[in-house]
Amino acid sequence: MLFPFIISLAGLFFLLINGILFFRTRKDKGFLYQIITVYLILLFVEELCCNIIGFYSPGSNFFLSHYYFLFQFIALSVFFYNLFRNIILKRIVLYCLILVLMILIVQYYETPGLYWEFNFLEIEMTSILLIIYALIFLIKNFKRAKHEYLYLCNGLIIYLASSLSIFLSGNTDSVIFTEPFILDFWFFNSLFYILYQFLIFKEWRSLNNKIKVSDTELIDDSEEL
């Protein structure tokens, strides 16, 4: 169990680094940048609690998954709402956000015991919609050589698709092998999570390099004047 847990902590560490990088460079950035900053910081808090509880009491941290998926869905829905320029896409994102939240409120009201378990409907709805939003954004900007948040959207698709496939296949408790250490499907999910964080880091570097280039161009123009 130790090796997969170390891999999980590695993902948590990269998440912390990304959160710090975005937080330290958030000044004078746009609303989208601020959303990602808040998303990463609060995600780190949730993941930290999940790892601590999971380490000391395995299997008792399922309730935290609801906060993870719902917060991620709300934060990234706001992100894509502001990222899209098409008014129809904006309305679709807004209506889907309201509809999903209403469905889940009714579901938890009628079945409160779901709070202590994985809610597969919650996971499927929130993950699939975010994957669709990211795919739409990538398709609409496919011909553009450079665009903000392409790395993030690619990472989001890869990570959510991998975790969603685990839930849809019903392999949440499946073990691949036990020697020399226990390895289950969540190990691979952790690897994809690290890849996701790496692409977020590349997004941060791309966004800030772009700003530095713009500042340099402004300085050059002023010198010419």
Regions picked out by a protein language model, each given a short descriptive name:
Residues 1-225:
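Terminal, non-globular segments
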